[in-house]
Amino acid sequence: MSEYMKNEILEFLNRHNGGKTAEIAEALAVTDYQARYYLLLLEKEGMVQRSPLRRGMATYWFLKGEMQAGQNCSSTT
C-alpha cells in the first residue's frame, strides 16, 4: 500500500472520528472497492478497526481503539 493512501485514510478517520467505506472512497476519489482494499490492509496492520459485520448494514471504520461502546453503527449505506 502506498504511504500516501495510508496517510490519507488515517487522516480522514482522525478528522471525522471514523466513517463508512463509501464516505472514505468519495473523499479520496477512489472506488468503494479500492477503499475497502486499503482499509482491510490497514486492519491487518492493526491500525484501524471496523464495526461488527451485519448483513445489509454499512461498515464503519475507526482508528484502532477509537470506537466507543455506545456508538450507533446501525444506519445503512
Swiss-Prot record:
The keyword Transcription regulation appears for this protein: yes
Keyword Transcription regulation included in the entry's annotation: yes
Superkingdom of the organism of origin: Bacteria
InterPro entries for this protein: FaeA, WH-like_DNA-bd_sf, WH_DNA-bd_sf
Pfam family, one: FaeA
Swiss-Prot/TrEMBL keywords: Activator, Fimbrium biogenesis, Transcription, Transcription regulation
Gene Ontology biological process: regulation of DNA-templated transcription
SUPFAM superfamilies referenced in this protein's UniProt entry, alphabetically: Winged helix' DNA-binding domain
Protein name: Major pilus subunit operon regulatory protein
Organism: Escherichia coli
